[in-house]
């Protein structure tokens, strides 16, 4: 089992998308790389925590390789958007990939370079070692499963399509 942390705007959609993929073992949403211990949603939204809304994704590398995760992630967010995704604006909505295993860094950066070359654009996606992660409040967990009409900037049904690099 491997783990990666993905930030691409509101964490509801990122979780909704990746939870539909074969190879996802479990996930939870929360706040990554916060300057404050165990921040609340309200404090994160104030912009004073330094945290980013993120998905903690545990996955089976044989069924869902990291390259596919990063490729899919980049296909459902706007990697060129600085501090916003869709209608969500603020530093807590910046996009990034946060790794635990050092060996993941080169794979993530390679995938980003391939995306930039293919799209002729410069991504602003952060690629950093995870400093910390705090679980979000219970009402945020699996939000789109519990609230089918909840706002989301990501079409989570795209996860059902066959992946092609």
UniProtKB/Swiss-Prot annotation:
One of its GO terms (cellular component) is cytoplasm. It holds the Pfam family PMSR. One of its GO terms (molecular function) is peptide-methionine (S)-S-oxide reductase activity. The active site is at 10. InterPro entries: Met_Sox_Rdtase_MsrA_dom (IPR002569), Met_Sox_Rdtase_MsrA_sf (IPR036509), MsrA_MetSO_reductase (IPR050162). Signal peptide: none annotated. Its EC number is 1.8.4.11. GO terms for biological process: cellular response to oxidative stress; protein modification process. It catalyses: L-methionyl-[protein] + [thioredoxin]-disulfide + H2O = L-methionyl-(S)-S-oxide-[protein] + [thioredoxin]-dithiol; [thioredoxin]-disulfide + L-methionine + H2O = L-methionine (S)-S-oxide + [thioredoxin]-dithiol. It comes from the Bacteria. Keywords: Oxidoreductase. Has an important function as a repair enzyme for proteins that have been inactivated by oxidation. Catalyzes the reversible oxidation-reduction of methionine sulfoxide in proteins to methionine. Belongs to the MsrA Met sulfoxide reductase family. This is Peptide methionine sulfoxide reductase MsrA. The lineage of its organism: Bacteria, Pseudomonadati, Campylobacterota, Epsilonproteobacteria, Campylobacterales. The gene is msrA.
């Amino acid at each position: 089992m491997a783990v990666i942390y993905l930030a691409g705007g509101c964490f509801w959609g990122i979780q909704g998308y990746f939870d539909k993929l074969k190879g996802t073992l479990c996930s939870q949403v929360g706040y990554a790389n916060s300057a404050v211990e165990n921040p609340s949603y309200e404090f994160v939204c104030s912009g004073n925590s330094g945290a980013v809304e993120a998905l903690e994704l545990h996955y089976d590398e044989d069924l869902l390789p990291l390259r596919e995760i990063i490729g899919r992630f980049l296909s459902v967010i706007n990697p060129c958007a600085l501090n916003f995704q869709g209608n969500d604006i603020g530093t807590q909505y910046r996009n990034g990939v946060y790794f635990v295993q050092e060996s993941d860094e080169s794979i993530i950066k390679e995938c980003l370079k391939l995306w930039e070359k293919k799209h002729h654009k410069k991504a602003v996606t952060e690629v950093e070692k995870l400093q910390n992660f705090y679980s979000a409040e219970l009402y945020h967990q699996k939000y789109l499963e519990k609230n089918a009409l909840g706002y989301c900037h990501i079409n989570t049904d795209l996860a059902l399509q066959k992946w092609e690099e």
